[in-house]
Design a protein with these regions (language model features):
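Charged, often Cys/His-bearing segments associated with DNA-binding zinc-finger transcription factors
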Residues: 1-50, 525, 531, 536-539
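An anionic, glycine-rich sequence signature occurring as long contiguous blocks
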Residues: 2-15, 102, 292-421
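Basic, short loop/linker segments at the boundary and entry of helix-turn-helix/winged-helix-like folds
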Residues: 33-82, 134
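Short, solvent-exposed helix-loop connector elements
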Residues: 62-69, 410-418, 432-449, 468-476
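Short, conserved catalytic/metal-binding motifs centered on acidic residues
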Residues: 80, 95-96, 138-144, 175-187, ...
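Active-site-proximal, Lys/Arg-enriched surface segment
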Residues: 141-228, 540-541, 545
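Electropositive, glycine- and tryptophan-enriched low-complexity nucleic-acid-binding patches
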Residues: 205-267
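A short, flexible helix-boundary coil/loop motif
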Residues: 318-361, 432, 437-438, 444, ...
Length: 546
């Protein structure tokens, strides 16, 4: 978890143990490092950033207002779960050990030291058969899970959308957005309440008398949900999310999720282009995207008439209507002394005004294209003749279509190539590193909480890292940053406190306590406060000095 937090929030945490550090100072009179307490923890800086861009109040709005007795403000449940998501804790059970018993982290969530040690209430303690742990933790893991799934899907969706709005207002995104849209399956078992199901073909490892590594196609039932996302390719931030059951077709929600993305960034930014995969090949939807002034790029299916026409036209491009371009790139392979360079060629043929896309119209494939007055709408096509030195046969050539300009076919080609970023940097990363498919409970509500919180934290932590880079740039130019102003405020609140690090532990003390524990007399302060070196040792360790 620590390495994950360092990567995502660019800070460092250690185990707080005031007694151990006090004993070390008393006996050895040395320490590794010491900072004033304005060197806040990783989450404290992150929470400050959320307040600065006005996202923190949105966390308070997640309260479903269903608690009859509000012993604990709902925001505290949200903050703990947020830490679970960012800390990449795969299951709910380890949350107790990694978060709920950590006094420093729970302090940031609003719990005090007594609650961390003794729990926030006595409910269930009399019925407990096992011995009570020395540190109960601020919450029970089951309580956290039961409370967090009470957030309604509508509140979660609003939280995500408003968070993206705040990022757009903070000018995190480029002025003209080039986006990608794709879906991913959120597979579960049939035991999840509210899940959908679909009968799909899957390739599995073959058994029996078959070649090594040979795969066999079998049909299986899949259960779960499907997640739609609009992804801003430059920053790597998802700007709109939609969830439905797993059997729904890809093109069902493309217009809805695109409209939401436009709404989320409309105050300061504009979506200029959208790349989609073959699963979104629906003429009616693509026509609607075109009417919104958004350029799209999509590959055609191999058996379509438009695909065959484009390939045939690419063979006879000498007539002057087509545009052929070749790009050479040097790719380095190997490491050290074994490195070698390879010249990689890619050849494209741009075909303007392809007239055989008769499915591209307001009615889609349902339109009567045989009518005498039917006029097909032209689209521009790009045929890939050679891709990274690989020249496939004509019937295997990839064909893209776009409603955008075709001055340079590589603009279309590169734009579609960016679509792989949503697969690798969003869906694969959130599943593998953010544990997207590990909800707090095996229910529809649990899945919605996990998806929206993971996607929101993915967006906000990415923006936070970008913000830190900007703060460092301003600091290098000699300009005051909001980070520095925040540190000054912390220094005023904690000007007499120090945080002392000894190996993997740290402790927080008043400044005179650190000095006196290391056996350096502070006569005036000791007299005014009536403290001694021994009394300070006992205060933190509960023991008499050795």
């Amino acid at each position: 978890m620590h390495n994950t937090l360092i990567e995502r929030l660019f800070w460092h945490t250690a185990q707080r143990d005031d007694a151990k550090v006090a004993d070390h100072l008393y006996c050895r009179k040395e320490m590794d490092t010491v900072y004033t307490l304005d060197e806040a923890t990783l989450f404290d800086f992150f929470f400050h950033y959320l307040r600065e861009i006005e996202v923190f109040p949105l966390l308070e709005e997640l309260d479903p207002e269903t608690q009859e007795r509000e012993n604990i403000p709902f925001l505290q449940f949200v903050l703990v779960y947020l830490m679970r998501v960012i800390g990449s804790i795969p299951k709910m059970e380890p949350v107790w050990e990694l978060l709920l018993t950590d006094e420093l982290l729970m302090g940031l969530c609003g719990f005090n030291a007594y609650q961390v040690k003794n729990g926030s209430c006595d409910r269930g303690t009399k019925l407990r058969k096992a011995p009570m742990p020395e540190v109960r933790g601020a919450l029970c893991v089951d309580t956290l899970a039961n409370q967090i799934v009470k957030i309604t899907p509508r509140r979660l969706e609003n939280f995500f959308n408003h968070s993206i709005e705040r990022l757009a207002q903070a000018r995190v995104f480029p002025k003209y957005i080039h986006a990608a849209c794709d879906t991913t399956l959120y597979e579960t078992t049939d035991q999840y309440e509210g899940c959908g199901s679909v009968f799909r073909e899957r390739k599995v490892k073959a058994r029996g008398y078959r070649k090594a590594g040979e795969l066999k196609a079998v049909k299986v039932w899949l259960y779960g949900w499907k997640v739609w996302a609009i992804y801003e390719v430059q920053t790597g931030i998802p700007i709109a999310i939609k969830i439905d059951t797993i059997e729904k077709p890809d093109n069902l929600h493309v217009l809805a999720v695109l409209e939401q993305a436009k709404q989320n960034v409309k105050q300061t930014r504009v979506i200029r282009s959208l790349v989609v995969d073959r699963g979104f090949l629906d003429g009616k939807s693509l026509y609607a995207i075109d009417q919104q002034g958004i350029e799209f790029v999509i590959p055609l299916k191999s058996n379509m008439e438009a695909t065959r026409d484009a390939r045939a036209l690419a063979l006879s491009y000498e007539d002057g209507t087509c545009i052929e371009k070749t790009r050479e790139v040097t790719v380095t392979h190997g490491y050290g002394k074994n490195t070698w360079d390879e010249k990689v060629l890619t050849t494209l043929v741009g075909i303007p005004g392809l007239m055989s896309c008769d499915w591209f119209n307001p009615e889609g494939s349902e339109a009567n294209t045989a009518k005498k007055d039917y006029e097909p709408i032209p689209l521009n096509a790009v045929v890939v003749k050679t891709w990274n030195n690989q020249t496939p046969p004509v019937d295997k050539q990839v064909v893209f279509v776009t409603n955008g300009e075709l001055k340079d076919p590589f603009v279309v080609f590169d734009r579609y190539d960016d679509r792989s970023l949503i697969e690798n940097n969003l869906f694969r990363e959130t599943k593998q590193d953010w544990h997207l498919q590990d909800p707090p409970k095996k229910t529809r509500e649990g899945v919605f909480v996990q998806v929206y919180m993971v996607m929101a934290m993915k967006a906000l932590t990415k923006a936070f890292l970008m913000w830190q880079e900007e703060q460092q740039r301003l600091h290098a130019l000699g300009k005051e940053t909001s980070w520095e102003m925040y540190r000054r405020r912390l220094k005023m609140l904690n000007r007499n406190k120090l945080i002392v690090f000894v190996e993997d532990n740290f402790g927080i003390f008043l400044s005179h306590e650190v000095i006196m524990l290391t056996d350096v007399p502070v006569h005036k302060t000791a007299k005014e406060l009536g403290v001694t070196r021994s009394s300070i040792y006992t205060k933190y360790t509960g023991l008499s000095p050795p």
